[in-house]
Structures are given as structure tokens and as C-alpha cells.
Swiss-Prot record:
Gene3D superfamilies, per the entry: 1.20.5.340
Region (Disordered) residue spans: 1-44
Key words of the record: Acetylation, Calcium, Calcium transport, Coiled coil, Ion transport, Membrane, Mitochondrion, Mitochondrion inner membrane, Transmembrane, Transmembrane helix, Transport
Subunit structure: Interacts (via coiled coil regions) with MCU; the interaction is direct. Interacts with SMDT1/EMRE; the interaction is direct. Interacts with PPIF.
Protein known as: Mitochondrial calcium uniporter regulator 1
Residue(s) carrying N6-acetyllysine: K204
Mitochondrial matrix compartment residues: 75-316
Chief location: mitochondrion
Source lineage: Eukaryota, Metazoa, Chordata, Craniata, Vertebrata
Function statement: Key regulator of mitochondrial calcium uniporter (MCU) required for calcium entry into mitochondrion. Plays a direct role in uniporter-mediated calcium uptake via a direct interaction with MCU. Probably involved in the assembly of the membrane components of the uniporter complex (uniplex).
Outcome of gene disruption: Conditional knockout mice lacking Mcur1 in cardiomyocytes and endothelial cells are viable and are born at the expected Mendelian. They however show impaired mitochondrial calcium uptake and mitochondrial calcium uniporter (MCU) current.
Length: 340
């Protein structure tokens, strides 16, 4: 129940209704509750303080001792004096009104905390309701009164309120309690309904257990047999795979050993061939060295023979040249003597 719904349900004020003076209570306004001016506007709920108003009654109504002392000390005013506009309230009435307002504001603070805790409780209770709601409650439950309205009206009149103001306040409190109790009945369940829901849940659990036993006897046995068959097949396949793997391993080992022996034989043959080739190469190198030494010796002998022949031819040519030169000189001298 929010402030909008309360404002919509509030009856309209007649023009003849008088307001209390603004200085009647002498208390500054607070954000949760407005002051006395405006008649019943000080009971206008704001925010979360409108929901948990059942505690508001206990905080609003003063104790019997305070009420007795207030009524004993304050003189009783007549109806004509109450209906006069602009009449100042007596000091006892003002004190009682201030006490009621102080209790109301203190209750507003407590109500905010209680509203938040009640909201958390309702949210946690919704998970365990199991779809049992309170729509089928009798109307007498939601329409019954939870406090003495006549005594509260009399108490408000004794504290300085008019009859109309007291009736409006009591009607607003009755509506607030009805809406809060309806919200509580919608959010919560009774102990009997909780026991019924618990019995239903237990019966459903028993049915599920029976179904599980039946499934274990019928379907689970078949599933177990199928699982055993599958396990046997898997074991056989595993054995076959292991046999194949061992065969492949032995074949590969044999092939590897054969190839290894063949490679070793080829390596030995290649080594032998390499040794033979090396011996042949060494022999060829020796033959080449021998042939080279023989040719070198032959060349040296030929060169020495040619040198000796050249020396001999040199001497012969020198002899012939010397003889030819002397002959020419002798002929020239002979001709020279002849001419002279």
C-alpha cells in the first residue's frame, strides 16, 4: 500500500471543517509524516512507513496513566467550543498532541526498519509457499477490527482533536491495518497450510521414491545388463586391439632388426670396396711416381747430351770461323800487294 492509494481512498473534506492552527503542535515537519495543519494530512504515509502501521497504533496511543492524568488535569471542552474556528487549544491538549506526534514520528522510524525486515521475510517465505495463496480467505478475516475504534476516537477527542478528525484518523488507521494484513496474508501462510504443504511434499517424495524403486527394478536392471554387455564388448575390443598392437610391435621389431643387419652387411661391403679402391689408388700413385721419375731421368740425360753436342758444335764453328777469317785476310793482303 503506497501513499497514492491512501490519498485516493481518503474522503474529501467538507468546507465547514476547520483546520487546527499551524502553531498547535510546535514541532517541525519531518520527511515521513506531515504536521497537523491540513486536518488529517499529518497521517499521510510516505515511503515505506505506510506498510508496517500495526505497530503505529501501539506507538500512537499513549499509556492509560498518561491519558488519565491528561484528562484529569485538562478541563473538558464542550462541543460548541471545539467547533469554533481559530480557538487556541489548551496546554494539556497541546502536550498530549505533542506526545502523540512524538510517538508517531518515533514509530515512523521504527516502521521503516520493520518494513524492510518484513519485506525480506516475505521474499524468503515466497520460496516455501508452494503455490498456496490466500485469495480464498473469508471476508471476515480481512474485515475484522484489530483495536477498539471507539476508545481511540475518545482518546483523540481527549487529546484535542475534533470528532471528524478523530473519525478520519481512525478510518485511515483501519484501512492501513486492513491493507497491511491483506499483504501479510498474501505473502505468508498459516501453520495449518504449512503442515498441509509439508505433507503434500512428503507424499510426493514418497511417490518419487516408489517410482525410483520401480525404475531400479525394471529399467535400471535392463540398463545394467546393457552396460555389462557393453563392458564385455569393450573388453574384447581392448584385447583385440592389444593383440594387434603386440603383433605390429613384433613385426616392426623384426623388420627393424633385419634392416639393421642388412645395413651392417652393406656397410661392411662398402668398407671392403673402399679399402680395395684405396689400395688400387695407392698402387696407381706409385706407378705414376715411377713413370715420372723415369721420364725425368730420360729428359735429364737427353738435355745433358744436347749440351755436350752444342759445346762440340760451338768449337767446330769457332774453328771454321777463325780459318775463314785468316783466309780472307791473306787474300786481301795478297790483292793489296798486287795493287801496290
Amino acid at each position: 500500500m503506497d501513499s497514492g492509494s491512501v490519498a485516493a481512498e481518503r474522503p474529501r473534506r467538507t468546507p465547514s471543517r476547520q483546520r487546527l492552527p499551524s502553531s498547535g503542535c510546535g514541532v517541525p515537519a519531518r520527511p515521513g509524516v506531515s504536521t497537523l495543519p491540513g486536518g488529517r494530512s499529518w497521517l499521510r504515509p510516505r515511503g515505506r512507513a505506510a506498510r508496517a502501521s500495526p505497530l503505529l497504533f501501539l506507538l500512537l496511543v499513549p499509556s492509560p496513566r498518561l491519558a488519565a492524568t491528561a484528562t484529569a488535569t485538562a478541563p473538558r471542552r464542550t462541543l460548541a467550543e471545539r467547533s469554533r474556528p481559530g480557538l487556541v487549544l489548551p496546554a494539556a491538549a497541546l502536550g498530549a498532541g505533542r506526545n502523540a506526534l512524538g510517538r508517531l514520528r518515533l514509530g515512523a522510524r521504527r516502521v521503516a526498519a520493520l518494513a524492510s525486515s518484513r519485506r525480506e521475510l516475505s521474499l524468503s517465505a515466497k520460496c516455501h509457499q508452494l503455490e498456496h495463496r490466500k485469495e480464498n480467505l473469508p471476508l471476515s478475516v480481512s474485515r475484522q477490527l484489530y483495536f477498539d475504534t471507539h476508545a481511540l476516537v475518545c482518546l483523540l477527542e481527549a487529546n484535542g482533536f475534533t470528532i471528524q478528525q478523530a473519525e478520519i484518523i481512525v478510518s485511515a488507521l483501519v484501512k492501513i491495518t486492513e491493507t497491511n494484513m491483506n499483504i501479510i496474508y498474501k505473502d505468508m501462510v498459516s501453520k495449518m497450510q504449512q503442515e498441509i504443504a509439508l505433507q503434500q511434499v512428503l507424499s510426493k517424495i514418497a511417490n518419487v521414491k516408489k517410482d525410483m524403486v520401480i525404475l531400479e527394478k525394471s529399467e535400471f536392471s535392463a540398463l545394467r545388463a546393457e552396460n555389462e554387455k557393453i563392458k564385455l564388448e569393450l573388453h574384447q575390443l581392448k584385447q583385440q586391439v592389444m593383440d594387434e598392437v603386440t603383433k605390429v610391435r613384433t613385426d616392426t621389431k623384426l623388420n627393424f632388426n633385419l634392416e639393421k643387419s642388412r645395413v651392417k652387411e652393406l656397410y661392411s661391403l662398402n668398407e671392403k670396396k673402399m679399402l680395395e679402391l684405396r689400395t688400387e689408388i695407392v698402387s696407381l700413385h706409385a706407378q705414376q711416381d715411377r713413370a715420372l721419375t723415369q721420364t725425368d731421368r730420360k729428359i735429364e740425360t737427353e738435355v745433358a747430351g744436347l749440351k755436350t753436342m752444342l759445346e762440340a758444335h760451338k768449337l767446330d764453328t769457332i774453328k771454321y770461323l777463325a780459318g775463314s777469317v785468316f783466309t780472307c785476310l791473306t787474300v786481301a793482303l795478297g790483292f793489296y800487294r798486287l795493287w801496290i
